[in-house]
Amino acid sequence: MPPQLALLLTSAFVLIVLTIEYRRSDITSAASWILSLWLAYSGSKGIGAFLNINTTIESGSLPDRYFLLSVGIVGILILFKRGFPLGAALKRNGLFVLILAYMLLSVVWAKAPGISFRRWGRELITLIMICLLISEEFPAKTFVSAFKRAIYFYLPFSILLIKYFGIFGREYNRWTGE
């Protein structure tokens, strides 16, 4: 089978499975889909890797930055729309806030402050996603639904990449070549 046909069939299959999951699930909020997108992104290579964008670790990938920025902004907007009590949540989790503040402070003495700051930003987006999850009516059901959607995306596309697009689906040890 030609790789393009396999990609088309896999994409159609994933869309059908996601549609079935959407209809069967009682979790239909937009936040659960944002969480699913973020989970799918977090568990795979970056978007830049699939687009063959050669970047250094210091500069990162522009599509990845834009994706994370978009997900973070949409998450913040949803939290504001829901009236999420961020101040109260931060007060109840003082130790977590202290760890985040320490991580931000560590940017000052890091060997590569730009990389450290970007990684801190990713942790902040993780916090936004957690707040989205706990602001849902049924957080446990929402998490299961978002995780299912991410798996429905991962599994078929992983098989597709391994079988038809080996350059993206297989990686060898850079030190031994195995």
Enumerate the predicted regions with their spans.
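Residues at structural and domain junctions
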Residues: 23, 103-106, 119, 129-132
